[in-house]
Structure formats: C-alpha cells, structure tokens
C-alpha cells in the first residue's frame, strides 16, 4: 500500500489535471481531519481505503517495470529489498504523518537519480524542500553505515575470480583490480580547514572520486574526499589502499597487482602503461592496449554510475563529508544491483588531463621491480602473439 501511495503522488503530474487535483484534495482533506482530530466510523475508513486502493492500483497498472526503473534506477523487487534492509533504522522524517520508510527510500532514490531541483522533488512528495534534503542525508548515512560491506576488497576466491576474469577478457595476468577517477562538484565546503584547496582551475569547487574495480566493474574500494586539483598519485597515497601498498602490499595483493594509468607511480604492485615516446615496439604497444582495455572497466563503471545517479553532477552540498557519503551510497547501490546497471557505455574518458607521474618534479620512472615486471609481462604477450601466428600459419 505504501509503495502504491508513493508512486501515485510521484506520477501525479503525468496524468490529467483533474486526477492531480483529486489526489491533492484527498491528501489535504486527510491532513485537515487529523489536525482537527475528527472521529470517523471504521466502516468509513475501510471505504476510503478501498477507494484509494482502486485509484493507486489503476496508476500502478499503467506503470511498467521499465518505467519504474527509469525513475528509481532499481526494480520493484530490488526496492523492496532495500526497504527491508533499511526499515530497522531510526528514521527522523517518518515521524511526519503519513510518511513511511517506503516514502523515505523512494524519495531518496528519486532525488539521487535525477538533476531535478530539490524543491521540485519535494513537491512530488508533498513535503518541504528542507525535509527532502534532510531525508537524503539520512538515507545516505543509513546506507553507508549498514551496507558498507557491499564495497570490499577482494580476497580468496573473489580475488582469484577477478584475476581469471581480467586474464580472459583483457589478457593481462595477475591483475586484481583497476582504478579510475572522476570529479564530483560541491558547493564551497564549510567542514574543511581550507575550502579554497577544493577550488579547481575553472573556479568551481569539486572533489575527486577514485574508484577501484574488479573484472566485472564492481567497486572494491572508493575514495571521495580529496580535492580534484590533487594529482592522482597524491590522492592514491592518501587513501587506505595507498597506505596498504606502502606498509604491507603482500597482505593486500598476495602477489597480484593493480592496473592504473600513467599518472600513478609504477611498482611491482601497481602497473602502468609504457611511456609513449613514439618508439614503442610491438610488444609494448600490445601491452599498452591491454592496459587501456582494463582501465575501460573502471571508467565504464564510473560513467554508468554518474549516468544512473545524475544527482552526483549537482549535489549542491557545502560539506565534503556529506558529498562523500552520497557518492559512496551510489557506489553501494551500484554494487548491490550490478545487473541493473551492467550496460555498455560510449564515453569512458577521465575527468581531467594530468601529467604522467614520471614527468612530475618529484616523480620517477618506477621501481626496479615494477620496471622488470612490466617488461616481463610485455615479453610474454609478444611470445603468445608469435605462437598464435605460428599455429595458424
């Protein structure tokens, strides 16, 4: 019943004006009667509920599965599962008369899925704009605190499956994860010591999303709190993954490696492309092509994430912390319902061009172990290519 009520209000503007006025009139009458504490007979209550149910059912019958998913990004069954998981949380906003967990979840999903102004979203749910904003913050807090394990680093069987997946689809051995980045706009943050470090070259404020993905594009670690202006190598160093790479890379990777672009430092645990000096041999070109194919997995997931949850393009929050929670919430939902978003994308570019790490003032060409490992993998790709040519000649 709650789901039907929410959808009826949300889609009111999709129907005739008379239908909208009917919904609004009924809602106003109900609130007035509650305030005046009018007593009604049980039979009258049942009759009104039956009338509402008929109206809501009529609306639902016209709402296809694809229509529901286009509005909320999840299917009805996935939404029901999300409501079930978040129902035990102590929601502040559902104290309002007639407001349920269903309303809270659907309102938050709608807000995250569109760039529609907050006041417009509030009008759909017949509540205030401030309540929508508070509700969205609450939703993100509950999702990230109760469902955080949906984003986790692969170990054991999961790690082996990712390695096998990258080998079969891309052709690079021992690859555990790939990393991609993009930027998330924010308002001038008020919860950081120096907000100006978050101002980019265009005069806007933004943070960098750095996301690690497995072979399926599932997020295994995300960071969304550092300034966009920071070089990728600096952001990596400040993340938990970067710290683990410095302190105990064996425990993190178990002999495997991460793939990143040329903005990251090369090591035996973190492989990058060969610098393109226009003199690369066939083996190195082949290696670089496979690296680019693997990086497309992460950038594809990021692109799809921002396409599905368009609010990430205009969160309009003055808090880095709240922005980070919203980003992580969208990544968690992406992981939970991966099959919903597993679609091909055309645009898989990075957010901004940065200098390769080895061209930075403090950069270097890579550790000896990284240089050697990259050479060995490229050489093995060359041998495989020659072997295949021989077999089919």
Residue ranges and their predicted role:
Residues 1-93, 147-148, 153, 347, ...:
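Charged, often Cys/His-bearing segments associated with DNA-binding zinc-finger transcription factors
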Residues 75, 107, 121:
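Short alpha-helical segments in extracytoplasmic peptidoglycan/chitin-binding modules
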Residues 75-78, 82, 103, 117, ...:
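Generic hydrophobic, aliphatic-rich segments that mediate packing or membrane embedding
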Residues 76, 101-102, 202-207:
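Short, flexible loop/turn motifs enriched in small residues
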Residues 89-99, 188, 192-193:
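An N-terminal domain-cap segment
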Residues 101-114:
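Short, amphipathic alpha-helical "recognition" segments used to contact nucleic acids or chromatin
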Residues 117-120, 124-393:
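Short, well-ordered secondary-structure "scaffold" segments embedded in the functional core
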């Amino acid at each position: 019943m709650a789901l039907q009520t929410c959808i009826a209000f949300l889609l009111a503007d999709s129907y005739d004006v008379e239908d909208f006025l009917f919904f609004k009139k009924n809602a106003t009458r109900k609130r007035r009667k509650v305030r005046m504490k009018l007593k009604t007979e049980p039979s009258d209550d049942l009759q009104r509920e039956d009338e509402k149910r008929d109206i809501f059912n009529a609306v639902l019958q016209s709402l296809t599965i694809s229509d529901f998913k286009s509005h909320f990004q999840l299917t009805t069954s996935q939404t029901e599962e999300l409501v079930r998981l978040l129902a035990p949380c102590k929601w502040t906003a559902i104290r309002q008369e007639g407001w349920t967990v269903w309303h809270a979840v659907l309102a938050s999903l709608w807000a995250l899925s569109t760039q529609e102004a907050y006041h417009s979203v509030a009008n759909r749910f017949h509540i205030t704009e401030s309540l929508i904003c508070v509700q969205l913050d609450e939703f993100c807090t509950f999702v990230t605190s109760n469902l955080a394990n949906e984003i986790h680093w692969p170990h054991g069987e999961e790690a082996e499956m990712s390695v096998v997946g990258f080998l079969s689809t891309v052709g690079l051995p021992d690859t555990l994860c790939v990393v991609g980045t993009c930027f998330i706009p924010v308002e001038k943050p008020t919860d950081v010591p120096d907000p100006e470090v978050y101002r980019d070259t265009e005069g806007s404020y933004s943070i960098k999303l750095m996301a690690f993905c497995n072979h399926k594009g599932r997020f295994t670690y995300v960071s969304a709190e550092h300034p966009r202006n920071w070089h990728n190598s600096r952001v990596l160093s400040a993340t938990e993954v970067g710290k683990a790479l410095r302190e105990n890379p064996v425990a993190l990777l178990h002999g495997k490696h991460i793939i990143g672009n040329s903005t990251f430092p090369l090591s035996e645990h973190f492989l990058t492309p060969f610098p393109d000096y226009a003199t690369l041999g066939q083996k190195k070109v082949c290696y670089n092509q496979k690296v680019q194919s693997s990086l497309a997995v992460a950038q594809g997931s990021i692109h799809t994430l921002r396409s599905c949850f368009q609010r990430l393009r205009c969160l309009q929050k003055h808090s880095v912390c709240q922005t980070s929670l919203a980003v992580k919430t969208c990544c968690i939902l992406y992981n939970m319902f991966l099959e919903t978003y597993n679609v091909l994308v055309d645009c898989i570019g990075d957010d901004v061009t940065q200098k390769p790490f080895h061209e930075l003032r403090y950069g270097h060409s890579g550790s000896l172990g990284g240089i050697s490992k990259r050479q060995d993998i490229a050489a093995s790709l060359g041998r495989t290519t020659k072997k295949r040519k021989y077999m089919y000649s």
